[in-house]
Amino acid sequence: MEGNRDEAEKCVQIAREALSAGNRDKAQRFLQKAEKLYPLPAARALLEIIMKNGSTAGSSTHCRKPPGSSDQSKPSCGKDGTSGAGEGGKVYTKDQVEGVLSINKCKNYYEVLGVTKDAGDEDLKKAYRKLALKFHPDKNHAPGATDAFKKIGNAYAVLSNPEKRKQYDLTGSEEQACNHQNNGRFNFHRGCEADITPEDLFNIFFGGGFPSGSVHSFSNGRAAYSHQHQHRHSGHEREEERADGGFSVFIQLMPIIVLILVSLLSQLMVSNPPYSLYPRSGSGQTIKMQTENLGVVYYVSKDFKSEYKGTLLQKVEKSVEEDYVTNIRNNCWKERQQKTDMQYAAKVYRDEQLRRKADALSMENCKELERLTSLYKGG
Protein backbone atom coordinates (compact mmCIF):
# COMPACT_ATOMS: atom_id res chain seq x y z
CA MET A 1 0.00 0.00 0.00
CA GLU A 2 2.81 2.43 0.95
CA GLY A 3 4.66 1.53 -2.25
CA ASN A 4 1.60 2.55 -4.25
CA ARG A 5 1.48 5.84 -2.35
CA ASP A 6 5.07 6.68 -3.32
CA GLU A 7 4.32 5.92 -6.97
CA ALA A 8 1.16 8.04 -6.79
CA GLU A 9 3.13 10.99 -5.39
CA LYS A 10 5.63 10.63 -8.26
CA CYS A 11 2.75 10.75 -10.74
CA VAL A 12 1.41 13.93 -9.09
CA GLN A 13 4.84 15.55 -9.36
CA ILE A 14 5.04 14.64 -13.07
CA ALA A 15 1.55 16.10 -13.51
CA ARG A 16 2.63 19.35 -11.84
CA GLU A 17 5.61 19.62 -14.21
CA ALA A 18 3.33 18.93 -17.17
CA LEU A 19 0.97 21.69 -16.03
CA SER A 20 3.90 24.11 -15.75
CA ALA A 21 4.86 23.21 -19.33
CA GLY A 22 1.28 23.70 -20.51
CA ASN A 23 0.63 20.00 -21.26
CA ARG A 24 -2.79 19.47 -19.64
CA ASP A 25 -3.46 16.14 -21.35
CA LYS A 26 -0.30 14.60 -19.91
CA ALA A 27 -1.08 16.07 -16.49
CA GLN A 28 -4.57 14.58 -16.58
CA ARG A 29 -3.24 11.13 -17.54
CA PHE A 30 -0.76 11.05 -14.67
CA LEU A 31 -3.31 12.36 -12.16
CA GLN A 32 -5.72 9.60 -13.18
CA LYS A 33 -2.90 7.08 -12.81
CA ALA A 34 -2.15 8.47 -9.34
CA GLU A 35 -5.82 8.07 -8.38
CA LYS A 36 -5.71 4.39 -9.33
CA LEU A 37 -2.52 3.80 -7.33
CA TYR A 38 -3.49 5.60 -4.11
CA PRO A 39 -6.26 8.10 -3.17
CA LEU A 40 -4.16 11.25 -2.64
CA PRO A 41 -6.21 14.40 -1.89
CA ALA A 42 -3.78 16.50 -3.97
CA ALA A 43 -4.35 14.36 -7.06
CA ARG A 44 -8.13 14.48 -6.63
CA ALA A 45 -8.11 18.28 -6.15
CA LEU A 46 -6.03 18.93 -9.27
CA LEU A 47 -8.04 16.45 -11.34
CA GLU A 48 -11.36 17.99 -10.26
CA ILE A 49 -10.22 21.45 -11.38
CA ILE A 50 -8.93 20.14 -14.72
CA MET A 51 -12.13 18.17 -15.42
CA LYS A 52 -14.36 21.05 -14.33
CA ASN A 53 -12.64 23.56 -16.62
CA GLY A 54 -12.61 21.30 -19.67
CA SER A 55 -11.03 22.92 -22.70
CA THR A 56 -11.19 26.45 -21.33
CA ALA A 57 -7.71 26.23 -19.87
CA GLY A 58 -5.15 27.97 -21.93
CA SER A 59 -7.73 29.84 -24.01
CA SER A 60 -6.86 33.22 -22.54
CA THR A 61 -3.99 35.23 -23.93
CA HIS A 62 -1.04 35.82 -21.63
CA CYS A 63 0.44 39.25 -21.33
CA ARG A 64 4.04 38.29 -22.09
CA LYS A 65 7.28 40.23 -22.21
CA PRO A 66 8.77 40.71 -25.69
CA PRO A 67 11.67 38.38 -26.61
CA GLY A 68 15.06 39.56 -25.42
CA SER A 69 13.68 41.98 -22.84
CA SER A 70 15.27 41.98 -19.40
CA ASP A 71 13.56 41.88 -15.99
CA GLN A 72 14.37 45.57 -15.61
CA SER A 73 12.55 46.50 -18.78
CA LYS A 74 8.96 47.53 -18.67
CA PRO A 75 6.44 44.84 -19.72
CA SER A 76 4.87 45.55 -23.07
CA CYS A 77 1.40 45.25 -21.57
CA GLY A 78 1.96 47.59 -18.62
CA LYS A 79 0.21 50.91 -18.27
CA ASP A 80 2.01 54.19 -18.77
CA GLY A 81 3.17 56.12 -15.74
CA THR A 82 4.98 53.94 -13.21
CA SER A 83 4.69 54.73 -9.54
CA GLY A 84 7.82 52.89 -8.37
CA ALA A 85 10.10 49.92 -8.73
CA GLY A 86 10.11 46.61 -6.87
CA GLU A 87 12.98 44.22 -6.21
CA GLY A 88 15.58 44.09 -8.97
CA GLY A 89 14.29 47.36 -10.43
CA LYS A 90 11.03 45.83 -11.69
CA VAL A 91 8.55 48.61 -12.35
CA TYR A 92 4.90 48.79 -11.39
CA THR A 93 2.13 51.28 -11.94
CA LYS A 94 -0.05 53.24 -9.57
CA ASP A 95 -3.08 51.28 -10.81
CA GLN A 96 -1.32 48.01 -9.93
CA VAL A 97 -0.60 49.22 -6.39
CA GLU A 98 -4.21 50.31 -5.92
CA GLY A 99 -5.45 46.99 -7.30
CA VAL A 100 -3.26 44.98 -4.92
CA LEU A 101 -4.40 47.06 -1.94
CA SER A 102 -8.02 46.59 -3.00
CA ILE A 103 -7.67 42.77 -3.21
CA ASN A 104 -5.80 42.47 0.09
CA LYS A 105 -8.42 44.58 1.88
CA CYS A 106 -11.27 42.29 0.83
CA LYS A 107 -12.91 40.52 3.76
CA ASN A 108 -14.51 37.63 1.88
CA TYR A 109 -13.85 35.59 -1.23
CA TYR A 110 -16.86 36.96 -3.12
CA GLU A 111 -15.37 40.45 -2.82
CA VAL A 112 -11.97 39.14 -3.94
CA LEU A 113 -13.39 37.78 -7.21
CA GLY A 114 -15.89 40.60 -7.55
CA VAL A 115 -18.89 38.28 -7.91
CA THR A 116 -22.25 37.97 -6.20
CA LYS A 117 -23.08 35.17 -3.76
CA ASP A 118 -25.23 33.44 -6.38
CA ALA A 119 -22.46 33.45 -9.01
CA GLY A 120 -22.24 30.28 -11.12
CA ASP A 121 -19.22 28.34 -12.37
CA GLU A 122 -18.82 30.41 -15.54
CA ASP A 123 -18.91 33.66 -13.57
CA LEU A 124 -16.23 32.33 -11.21
CA LYS A 125 -14.02 31.15 -14.09
CA LYS A 126 -14.35 34.46 -15.91
CA ALA A 127 -13.49 36.44 -12.77
CA TYR A 128 -10.55 34.19 -11.90
CA ARG A 129 -9.04 34.30 -15.40
CA LYS A 130 -9.18 38.07 -15.45
CA LEU A 131 -7.71 38.58 -11.97
CA ALA A 132 -5.10 35.81 -12.10
CA LEU A 133 -3.49 37.29 -15.20
CA LYS A 134 -3.66 40.78 -13.76
CA PHE A 135 -2.06 39.92 -10.41
CA HIS A 136 0.36 37.14 -11.34
CA PRO A 137 3.72 38.02 -9.69
CA ASP A 138 5.52 37.70 -13.04
CA LYS A 139 3.41 40.51 -14.45
CA ASN A 140 2.47 42.58 -11.42
CA HIS A 141 5.53 43.66 -9.38
CA ALA A 142 3.66 45.92 -6.97
CA PRO A 143 4.24 45.26 -3.24
CA GLY A 144 1.79 42.63 -2.00
CA ALA A 145 1.01 41.25 -5.47
CA THR A 146 2.06 37.73 -4.44
CA ASP A 147 -0.35 37.78 -1.48
CA ALA A 148 -3.11 39.07 -3.73
CA PHE A 149 -2.41 36.27 -6.23
CA LYS A 150 -2.63 33.69 -3.42
CA LYS A 151 -5.89 35.21 -2.22
CA ILE A 152 -7.42 35.06 -5.69
CA GLY A 153 -6.38 31.40 -6.07
CA ASN A 154 -7.84 30.47 -2.68
CA ALA A 155 -11.04 32.34 -3.46
CA TYR A 156 -11.62 30.35 -6.64
CA ALA A 157 -10.57 27.07 -5.00
CA VAL A 158 -13.19 27.51 -2.27
CA LEU A 159 -16.08 28.95 -4.25
CA SER A 160 -15.75 26.50 -7.17
CA ASN A 161 -16.14 23.53 -4.80
CA PRO A 162 -19.80 23.12 -3.73
CA GLU A 163 -19.03 21.56 -0.35
CA LYS A 164 -16.32 24.07 0.59
CA ARG A 165 -18.46 26.93 -0.67
CA LYS A 166 -21.36 25.84 1.53
CA GLN A 167 -19.03 25.53 4.51
CA TYR A 168 -17.48 28.92 3.74
CA ASP A 169 -20.88 30.63 3.44
CA LEU A 170 -21.64 29.56 7.01
CA THR A 171 -18.56 31.37 8.37
CA GLY A 172 -19.16 34.63 6.57
CA SER A 173 -15.61 35.94 6.26
CA GLU A 174 -12.16 34.91 5.13
CA GLU A 175 -10.60 35.33 8.57
CA GLN A 176 -13.09 32.95 10.17
CA ALA A 177 -12.86 30.43 7.34
CA CYS A 178 -9.08 30.32 7.35
CA ASN A 179 -6.92 31.53 10.20
CA HIS A 180 -3.79 31.22 8.04
CA GLN A 181 -4.45 33.48 5.09
CA ASN A 182 -0.84 33.41 3.95
CA ASN A 183 -0.63 29.65 3.64
CA GLY A 184 -1.17 30.12 -0.06
CA ARG A 185 -2.98 26.85 -0.77
CA PHE A 186 -6.37 25.50 0.00
CA ASN A 187 -7.42 21.97 0.87
CA PHE A 188 -10.65 20.89 -0.81
CA HIS A 189 -11.55 18.53 2.01
CA ARG A 190 -9.73 19.60 5.19
CA GLY A 191 -10.07 23.32 5.84
CA CYS A 192 -7.09 25.42 4.82
CA GLU A 193 -4.38 22.79 4.54
CA ALA A 194 -2.84 22.66 1.11
CA ASP A 195 -3.86 20.42 -1.76
CA ILE A 196 -3.46 22.78 -4.72
CA THR A 197 -1.17 25.80 -5.07
CA PRO A 198 -2.12 29.08 -6.73
CA GLU A 199 0.50 28.29 -9.41
CA ASP A 200 -1.02 24.84 -10.05
CA LEU A 201 -4.44 26.43 -10.43
CA PHE A 202 -3.00 29.07 -12.77
CA ASN A 203 -1.30 26.42 -14.89
CA ILE A 204 -4.56 24.46 -15.20
CA PHE A 205 -6.31 27.54 -16.57
CA PHE A 206 -3.54 28.93 -18.75
CA GLY A 207 -1.33 25.93 -19.57
CA GLY A 208 1.89 27.24 -18.02
CA GLY A 209 3.21 30.43 -16.50
CA PHE A 210 4.92 33.55 -17.74
CA PRO A 211 8.30 33.09 -19.48
CA SER A 212 10.53 34.78 -16.91
CA GLY A 213 13.34 33.51 -14.70
CA SER A 214 11.70 34.25 -11.37
CA VAL A 215 10.71 31.75 -8.72
CA HIS A 216 7.56 32.02 -6.60
CA SER A 217 7.15 29.77 -3.57
CA PHE A 218 3.84 29.08 -1.89
CA SER A 219 4.08 27.35 1.51
CA ASN A 220 1.49 26.03 3.94
CA GLY A 221 3.78 25.45 6.94
CA ARG A 222 4.24 21.73 6.29
CA ALA A 223 5.74 21.66 2.82
CA ALA A 224 6.66 24.31 0.28
CA TYR A 225 6.08 24.04 -3.43
CA SER A 226 8.11 26.19 -5.83
CA HIS A 227 7.18 27.13 -9.34
CA GLN A 228 10.24 28.03 -11.44
CA HIS A 229 9.88 29.33 -14.96
CA GLN A 230 12.27 28.20 -17.65
CA HIS A 231 15.55 30.08 -18.22
CA ARG A 232 17.26 30.46 -21.55
CA HIS A 233 20.80 29.07 -21.34
CA SER A 234 23.56 29.91 -23.80
CA GLY A 235 25.65 27.19 -25.41
CA HIS A 236 28.58 28.09 -23.14
CA GLU A 237 26.45 27.58 -20.00
CA ARG A 238 25.29 24.18 -21.24
CA GLU A 239 28.90 23.07 -21.76
CA GLU A 240 29.82 24.14 -18.22
CA GLU A 241 26.84 22.24 -16.82
CA ARG A 242 27.86 19.07 -18.65
CA ALA A 243 31.46 19.39 -17.43
CA ASP A 244 30.36 19.81 -13.82
CA GLY A 245 27.64 17.18 -14.05
CA GLY A 246 29.82 14.12 -13.39
CA PHE A 247 31.48 15.61 -10.33
CA SER A 248 28.13 16.83 -8.96
CA VAL A 249 26.65 13.35 -9.28
CA PHE A 250 29.64 11.88 -7.46
CA ILE A 251 29.26 14.39 -4.60
CA GLN A 252 25.55 13.59 -4.34
CA LEU A 253 26.24 9.85 -4.19
CA MET A 254 28.98 10.14 -1.56
CA PRO A 255 26.64 9.86 1.49
CA ILE A 256 25.02 6.74 0.01
CA ILE A 257 28.42 5.14 -0.67
CA VAL A 258 29.55 5.87 2.90
CA LEU A 259 26.36 4.35 4.32
CA ILE A 260 26.82 1.19 2.25
CA LEU A 261 30.43 0.82 3.41
CA VAL A 262 29.48 1.35 7.06
CA SER A 263 26.68 -1.20 6.72
CA LEU A 264 29.03 -3.79 5.22
CA LEU A 265 31.63 -3.24 7.95
CA SER A 266 28.96 -3.55 10.63
CA GLN A 267 27.79 -6.86 9.23
CA LEU A 268 31.35 -8.19 9.18
CA MET A 269 32.06 -7.10 12.75
CA VAL A 270 28.79 -8.22 14.36
CA SER A 271 28.16 -11.95 14.73
CA ASN A 272 24.82 -13.40 13.67
CA PRO A 273 22.28 -14.06 16.48
CA PRO A 274 21.84 -17.72 17.42
CA TYR A 275 18.18 -17.66 16.34
CA SER A 276 15.85 -16.37 13.66
CA LEU A 277 12.11 -15.70 13.72
CA TYR A 278 11.95 -17.23 10.24
CA PRO A 279 13.71 -20.29 8.75
CA ARG A 280 17.01 -19.34 7.10
CA SER A 281 18.65 -22.11 5.12
CA GLY A 282 21.67 -19.94 4.32
CA SER A 283 22.72 -19.76 7.99
CA GLY A 284 21.49 -23.25 8.82
CA GLN A 285 18.74 -21.95 11.13
CA THR A 286 16.02 -24.37 10.06
CA ILE A 287 15.30 -26.32 13.27
CA LYS A 288 11.98 -25.18 14.74
CA MET A 289 11.72 -24.36 18.46
CA GLN A 290 9.21 -22.63 20.72
CA THR A 291 9.68 -20.35 23.74
CA GLU A 292 8.43 -21.66 27.05
CA ASN A 293 6.71 -18.45 28.19
CA LEU A 294 4.74 -17.09 25.21
CA GLY A 295 5.06 -20.00 22.82
CA VAL A 296 6.83 -17.94 20.14
CA VAL A 297 8.19 -20.05 17.30
CA TYR A 298 11.83 -19.48 16.32
CA TYR A 299 14.49 -21.30 14.32
CA VAL A 300 18.03 -22.38 15.29
CA SER A 301 20.96 -24.32 13.87
CA LYS A 302 21.79 -27.96 14.70
CA ASP A 303 24.44 -26.98 17.30
CA PHE A 304 22.10 -24.69 19.25
CA LYS A 305 20.83 -27.23 21.80
CA SER A 306 24.33 -28.27 22.81
CA GLU A 307 25.57 -24.66 23.18
CA TYR A 308 22.58 -23.01 24.88
CA LYS A 309 21.20 -24.56 28.05
CA GLY A 310 19.78 -23.37 31.36
CA THR A 311 20.30 -19.62 31.93
CA LEU A 312 21.74 -19.06 28.45
CA LEU A 313 18.65 -20.62 26.88
CA GLN A 314 16.38 -18.43 29.01
CA LYS A 315 18.22 -15.29 27.86
CA VAL A 316 17.92 -16.34 24.23
CA GLU A 317 14.19 -17.04 24.56
CA LYS A 318 13.64 -13.70 26.29
CA SER A 319 15.39 -11.98 23.38
CA VAL A 320 13.28 -13.98 20.91
CA GLU A 321 10.05 -12.87 22.60
CA GLU A 322 11.14 -9.23 22.76
CA ASP A 323 11.99 -9.23 19.04
CA TYR A 324 8.73 -10.96 18.21
CA VAL A 325 6.58 -8.55 20.25
CA THR A 326 8.37 -5.54 18.75
CA ASN A 327 7.79 -6.90 15.26
CA ILE A 328 4.11 -7.60 15.93
CA ARG A 329 3.61 -4.16 17.50
CA ASN A 330 5.14 -2.40 14.48
CA ASN A 331 3.05 -4.45 12.04
CA CYS A 332 -0.09 -3.75 14.08
CA TRP A 333 0.61 -0.03 13.90
CA LYS A 334 0.97 -0.28 10.11
CA GLU A 335 -2.33 -2.18 9.88
CA ARG A 336 -4.13 0.45 11.93
CA GLN A 337 -2.58 3.26 9.91
CA GLN A 338 -3.62 1.58 6.66
CA LYS A 339 -7.17 1.10 7.90
CA THR A 340 -7.39 4.70 9.13
CA ASP A 341 -6.13 6.04 5.79
CA MET A 342 -8.62 3.94 3.84
CA GLN A 343 -11.52 4.97 6.11
CA TYR A 344 -10.58 8.63 5.77
CA ALA A 345 -10.30 8.37 1.99
CA ALA A 346 -13.65 6.57 1.84
CA LYS A 347 -15.27 9.33 3.89
CA VAL A 348 -13.73 12.14 1.84
CA TYR A 349 -14.59 10.59 -1.54
CA ARG A 350 -17.85 9.01 -0.33
CA ASP A 351 -16.65 5.66 -1.58
CA GLU A 352 -18.78 2.91 -0.04
CA GLN A 353 -16.72 0.12 -1.63
CA LEU A 354 -13.51 1.52 -0.14
CA ARG A 355 -15.20 1.80 3.27
CA ARG A 356 -16.26 -1.86 3.17
CA LYS A 357 -12.75 -2.83 2.13
CA ALA A 358 -11.32 -0.92 5.10
CA ASP A 359 -13.78 -2.56 7.50
CA ALA A 360 -12.89 -6.00 6.13
CA LEU A 361 -9.14 -5.74 6.83
CA SER A 362 -8.13 -8.74 8.92
CA MET A 363 -5.72 -6.94 11.31
CA GLU A 364 -3.92 -10.23 12.07
CA ASN A 365 -0.97 -8.57 13.80
CA CYS A 366 -3.23 -6.54 16.08
CA LYS A 367 -5.09 -9.71 17.06
CA GLU A 368 -1.79 -11.40 17.85
CA LEU A 369 -0.73 -8.38 19.93
CA GLU A 370 -3.96 -8.66 21.94
CA ARG A 371 -3.23 -12.35 22.54
CA LEU A 372 0.28 -11.59 23.77
CA THR A 373 -1.01 -8.79 26.00
CA SER A 374 -3.55 -11.11 27.60
CA LEU A 375 -0.78 -13.66 28.25
CA TYR A 376 1.32 -10.99 29.93
CA LYS A 377 -1.60 -9.97 32.13
CA GLY A 378 -2.43 -13.57 32.88
CA GLY A 379 1.18 -14.23 33.89
UniProtKB/Swiss-Prot annotation:
Full protein name: DnaJ homolog subfamily B member 14
Subcellular location: Endoplasmic reticulum membrane; Nucleus membrane
Membrane topology (UniProt): Single-pass membrane protein
Quaternary structure and partners: Interacts (via J domain) with HSPA8/Hsc70. Forms a multiprotein complex, at least composed of DNAJB12, DNAJB14, HSPA8/Hsc70 and SGTA; interaction with DNAJB14 and HSPA8/Hsc70 is direct.
Transmembrane segments: 245-265
BP GO terms, sorted: chaperone cofactor-dependent protein refolding; protein-containing complex assembly
Stretches assigned to the Cytoplasmic side: 1-244
Transmembrane as UniProt keyword: yes
Gene3D superfamilies xrefs: DnaJ domain
Region (Disordered): 56-90
Family of the protein in this entry: Belongs to the DnaJ family. DNAJB12/DNAJB14 subfamily.
PANTHER family named among the record's database cross-references: AT29763P-RELATED (PTHR43908), DNAJ HOMOLOG SUBFAMILY B MEMBER 14 (PTHR43908:SF4)
InterPro entries, per database record: DnaJ_domain (IPR001623), DnaJ_domain_CS (IPR018253), DnaJ_subfamily_B/C (IPR051100), DUF1977_DnaJ-like (IPR015399), J_dom_sf (IPR036869)
Sequence ranges on the Lumenal membrane side: 266-379
Organism name: Mus musculus (Mouse)
